[in-house]
Amino acid sequence: MKNKHFDPKGKMPSPFTIELQNGWRQTLPFEDKRDFEEAQKGFIAAPPYKQIIAEAGNVAWDMGSYEFLLRGFDSVFDSIHPSLQRQAVLNMAYGLYEVLPDNIYQVRGFDLANMTIIKGNTGWILFDVLTCKETAKAALELVNEHLGHRRVVAVVYSHSHVDHYGGVRGVVDEANVKNGKVQIIAPVGFMEYAIAENVYSGTAMVRRAFFQYGLLLPRSPFGHVDQSIGKNTAAGNTGLIEPTRYIEQDIEELTIDGVKMVFQNTPGTEAPAEMNTYFP
């Protein structure tokens, strides 16, 4: 059994794997580069750093550890499925982007999820405030640096998974939520499922993620590459502030800071408690 055990530095793929990967390269439409063009639309700025340090002193986020992917999309990694490599390169978008001119922005590449920022009459409405306090705080600082400082008037949790609410304490003070200066909006059942899903299934979900995404492997063509919907989950200070307003009906309309939003409850889709938001 000598040399049959796992080598943390990786090893070259077998001829069978290479044959399979080459088959996908010839079958799928990799010549279509539109997604790469669209992924860079509206780019405003990237921060001067690639790491975000957690309050505990560990590295909460390290975008630089994935730069092996930027050798160029035409680089062939026989150890990575071609579709995963393509998606991993697309997920290297890092910084502040304009989505709807002078109205809607996104910070991408700071966590597994993106933070979406809506410009109200006087302040910011934040959608999905990332996994941890440190990455969310850094994202908001980037927004205020390039778009002008505004206070946060509302936060919207789209659903009950931690990468969409765990960074809330990095962008708002709980005292301002309690005194009514900041609203937090979430779908009905949010608190129940945000807590219960982690209590009942959290250990199993984390264990699954280690196998599913290779989270404990070195970041390399032979190890951890991407999580497909994003690079990874930030490893910082996760928190939760209870919503002040629940969307309980199938369809509800709400105007905050001059911005009209139409909410549609969609429970049991990607999460047990979830909703869509439409801007008329």
Say what each PLM segment does:
Residues 99, 185, 189-268, 272-273:
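Metallo-beta-lactamase
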Residues 267, 279-280:
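Structured mid-domain segments that build the active-site/substrate or prosthetic-cofactor binding neighborhood
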Residues 1-88:
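N-terminal pre-domain segments of enzymes
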Residues 122-123, 133-185:
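Active-site metal-binding motif and surrounding structural segment of the metallo-beta-lactamase
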Residues 89-150, 274-279:
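Conserved beta-strand hairpin/beta-sheet module of binuclear metal-dependent hydrolase folds
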Residues 81-99, 237, 249:
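Short acidic, Pro/Gly- and aromatic-enriched capping/linker segments at domain boundaries
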Residues 111-114, 131-134, 160-163, 190-193, ...:
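Solvent-exposed loop/turn segments at secondary-structure junctions
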Residues 74-86, 142-145, 152, 174-176, ...:
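Non-globular, low-confidence helical/coil segments that flank catalytic cores
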